[in-house]
Curated annotation (Swiss-Prot):
PANTHER family: UPF0502 PROTEIN YCEH. Belongs to the UPF0502 family. Transmembrane segments: none annotated. This is UPF0502 protein Acid345_3645.
Length: 214
């Protein structure tokens, strides 16, 4: 059975995994809650605007592949949950990494460590590297390392559930005629800005999860 997903199915799967971990009191998700999760602005790249039909189709796709299902519910409103644990037999740290890759696309180990912290507290960057390595060593692999882009120090990793050319790509940086020292300083500042943005998005999501729903 192929597990290749389209962008909509990848987003739905990532949201189901994320909400189970970060807001378990509201999980499994109703269709409306899942649509809102798919379209939220924080912790998503790219931003999407999925409608009800798109999410229903994505759920059917995931259900056919054994990755999602209707959740048992005593209420009238149907709810949905992922089935990644049974389908893939992943550890908690592996689930956190896969979820972030589904929600944001290719990322560096440093970005993954900061962004996945709301789902799993990694002991350090080495812990992230070892988790990525385990995901790459699976058969078939769930993660691959991408060729390093010009001007970047860290390699990026991505999941294999969706073709790489369908995943979000970082903007290409234009090289200017500046000294080598300035180049290094600019790259350092840009990396710091990226990390700060990731921390801000994480804090936003944590505050949002603490806000009671009326």
């Amino acid at each position: 059975m192929t597990l290749i997903l389209n962008p909509e199915s990848a987003r739905v799967l990532g949201c189901l995994i994320e909400k189970e971990i970060t807001t378990p009191e509201y999980y499994p998700l109703s269709l409306n809650a899942l649509i809102n999760a798919c379209n939220q602005k924080s912790n998503r790249d790219p931003a999407m605007s999925l409608d009800e039909d798109s999410v229903r189709v994505a759920l059917r796709n995931l259900t056919d592949k054994g990755l999602a299902r209707h959740a048992p519910s005593e209420g009238r409103v149907p709810k949905y949950e992922h089935d990644v644990n049974n389908a893939m037999q992943l550890s908690r740290r592996e689930v956190a990494i896969l979820c972030e890759l589904l929600l944001r696309g290719p990322q560096t180990p440093g970005e993954l460590r900061g962004r996945a912290e709301r789902m799993y507290k990694f002991e350090g960057i080495e812990d992230v590297h070892s988790t990525l390595q385990r995901l790459m060593e699976r058969d078939p692999a769930l993660v691959v390392v991408l060729p390093r882009q010009p001007g970047t120090k860290e390699a990026r990793y991505t999941h294999t559930l969706m073709p790489v050319d369908m995943q979000p790509q970082p903007a290409v940086e234009v090289s200017h005629s500046v000294s080598g020292g300035n180049d290094g300083r600019i790259a350092q500042l840009e990396a710091e800005v990226r990390e700060l943005r990731a921390e801000i998005e994480t804090l936003k999501e944590q505050v949002k999860s603490l806000t009671p729903v009326n």
